[in-house]
């Protein structure tokens, strides 16, 4: 495998907690620059496509991110404890939107800067064709 993209749903004591957040390896002086770029692209694509609250990108030293020998990103795609996020997550069309956003983020990671389209405009048929 060339990269690891781990999808999670979060939970919180408050039903008001909601939104998306992405994580890459980073601790002190050490970090994954490719993981950080992928996390940033994923976060921007998902927020642009879903309109969900932007929980931003964060460096973490979690084992999943630290011990993986390839760029690794963990994306929290919402909170099951949030009625708003939960309603979105049970909708197959919303899950398709998440999948498309993540696929576009991976595609954009490998595009030369001159060919990189603006966030939120590249669509799945253009990638698959």
Residue ranges and their predicted role:
Residues 1-129:
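Active-site-proximal helix/loop segments of hydrolytic enzymes
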